[in-house]
Amino acid sequence: MKIKADYVNEPQWRQLVVKSSLPEELKCLDELAHNLWWVWNFEARDLFRDLDPKLYSEVKHNPVLLLERLSYERKEEIVKDKALMKRIKALYEQFRAYMDVKPDSTRPSVAYFCMEYGIHSALKIYSGGLGMLAGDYVKEASDSNVDMCAVGFLYRFGYFTQTLSMEGQQIAKYEAQNFNSIPVERVYDNNGNPMVVDVPYTNYQVHASVWVANVGRVKLYLLDTDNEMN
């Protein structure tokens, strides 16, 4: 006699991301926070600061983390604040008008590749002048309405924080980035699965997860090799 056994006790691991919810009236803030357009738009930065000035300073001016940590009570206060809600609505309309402009099809499309991009300290994927130049190039491409796609890397630890010891020696402190709390989003394929690209390297295949950072009108695709497939 054969007995068919189902392995019901085997664990089924799934990724679970816990995020705080926003009231319907504030949903547009999440879209704004996940587009780095706010980096060079002072009205947007001032708005995020005014949502909670103390918290804004604590999260080092990262709007994604700011919204994640806003208290329920503060969210309710914002919704009831007519002046603040008017600013939110006006800013979102300004953002949508900016984003709805179609790329100039009379100019050639551009693919831009760089090892680092300096756009904001909330996205630690740069360390020096090369990154700052690349970041400015992408922002200018967005404002100039260039049909451009940029590609780079998403580093788990990014650059280090530098301090000095009592003896004057450099101390490097590495802090891991939580990709769910910075202005990037995972890219999915047509089947709804996280997109992964395979890159041949000597005798191996390197598997890179794909993320995207929205820099105004420009998509910045970031490859992340810090995963269990490697």
What are these regions (language model features)?
Residues 1-230:
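Catalytic cores of carbohydrate-active enzymes across secretory and cytosolic contexts
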